[in-house]
């Protein structure tokens, strides 16, 4: 069945997602949360956490765009090379 992801691959993707989620959570928590004397989250901690997550999401988006651009360039180069090789001399 084309286009469907196997259960094994779905589990693998979910594990990768959880690993990424846990890493982001830990990094932002370590960077932003400083006061453990109260149960309340301070406004500056909330702001820091939001900025931390936004920064990660923007970075991920930028990397994905660059990765996609790279693959497009590679595919174009391969297509051009294949076109040159298939032309009669």
UniProtKB/Swiss-Prot annotation:
Protein name in the entry: Mitochondrial import inner membrane translocase subunit Tim9
Entry-linked InterPro entries: Mito_inner_translocase_sub (IPR050673), Tim10-like (IPR004217), Tim10-like_dom_sf (IPR035427)
Subcellular location: Mitochondrion inner membrane
Organism encoding this protein: Gallus gallus
UniProt topology in membrane: Peripheral membrane protein
Pfam families with a match to the protein in the record: zf-Tim10_DDP
Keyword Disulfide bond: yes
Signal peptide: none
Primary localization class, coarse: mitochondrion
Subunit-structure text: Heterohexamer; composed of 3 copies of TIMM9 and 3 copies of TIMM10/TIM10A, named soluble 70 kDa complex. The complex forms a 6-bladed alpha-propeller structure and associates with the TIMM22 component of the TIM22 complex. Interacts with multi-pass transmembrane proteins in transit.
Motif (Twin CX3C motif): 28-52
Disulfide-bonded cysteines: 28-52, 32-48
Gene Ontology annotations of biological process type: protein transport
Function: Mitochondrial intermembrane chaperone that participates in the import and insertion of multi-pass transmembrane proteins into the mitochondrial inner membrane. May also be required for the transfer of beta-barrel precursors from the TOM complex to the sorting and assembly machinery (SAM complex) of the outer membrane. Acts as a chaperone-like protein that protects the hydrophobic precursors from aggregation and guide them through the mitochondrial intermembrane space.
Gene Ontology cellular component annotations, sorted alphabetically: mitochondrial inner membrane
Molecular function, one GO term: metal ion binding
Phosphoprotein as UniProt keyword: no
Similarity section: Belongs to the small Tim family.
UniProt keyword annotations, A-Z: Chaperone, Disulfide bond, Membrane, Metal-binding, Mitochondrion, Mitochondrion inner membrane, Protein transport, Translocation, Transport, Zinc
Record remark: domains: The twin CX3C motif contains 4 conserved Cys residues that form 2 disulfide bonds in the mitochondrial intermembrane space. However, during the transit of TIMM9 from cytoplasm into mitochondrion, the Cys residues probably coordinate zinc, thereby preventing folding and allowing its transfer across mitochondrial outer membrane.
